[in-house]
């Protein structure tokens, strides 16, 4: 109930302000601040873009959230956790069918910066593979807690993905 109200208020405020919502366009038009050639940290001033993103799902709130977004004609980027994807693969397919972007938020939501290269690779690639099996190509990786290092960037680059904070 509180989540739905918060989403309605935020969505209405954005729409009333006349802000365009374009999930995932930060790297497409060069408007983002890029670090190490692959990590998008923030949008440039004056770009008139707003990215609406949700992390840690899919969850019990995802279907209601999708309904609210659909009613308002809004698309968003959902950064999903692999453990949750295994329990709700049908929601991932529906999210994509409804025009939302799907991003990788690692398999178990661990702080990547504190993991070995192999453990980071496993956290990221296992989600990429789960998504591929569902017909989803994830162009963006959002490290949990915003924690990443040069190894994370290299793994993302090898996957053809960008780090998106």
Identify what each model region corresponds to.
Residues 1-13:
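Bacterial N-terminal signal peptides that target proteins for export
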Residues 11-13, 23, 72:
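N-terminal regions of proteins, emphasizing targeting and processing segments when present
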Residues 17-25:
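C-terminal segment of classical bacterial N-terminal signal peptides
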Residues 30-115, 119-120, 126-132, 136-138:
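Active-site beta->alpha N-cap acidic-glycine motif
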Residues 137-139, 147, 152-165:
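His/Asp/Glu-enriched short active-site or ligand-binding loop at hydrolase and phosphoryl-transfer sites
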């Amino acid at each position: 109930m509180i989540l739905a109200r918060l989403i309605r208020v935020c969505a209405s405020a954005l729409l009333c302000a006349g802000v365009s919502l374009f999930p995932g366009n930060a790297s497409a038009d060069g408007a983002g601040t890029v670090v190490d050639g692959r990590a998008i940290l923030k949008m440039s001033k004056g770009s008139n873009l707003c990215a609406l993103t949700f992390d840690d799902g899919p969850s019990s709130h995802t279907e209601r959230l999708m309904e609210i977004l659909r009613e308002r004609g809004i698309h968003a980027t959902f950064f999903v956790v692999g453990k949750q994807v295994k329990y709700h693969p049908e929601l991932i397919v529906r999210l994509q069918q409804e025009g939302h972007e799907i991003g990788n938020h690692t398999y178990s939501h661990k702080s990547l910066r504190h993991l070995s290269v192999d453990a980071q690779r496993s956290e990221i690639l296992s989600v990429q593979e789960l998504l591929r099996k569902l017909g989803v190509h994830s162009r963006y990786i959002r490290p949990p807690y915003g924690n990443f290092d040069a190894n994370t960037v290299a793994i993302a680059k090898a996957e053809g993905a960008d780090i998106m904070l």
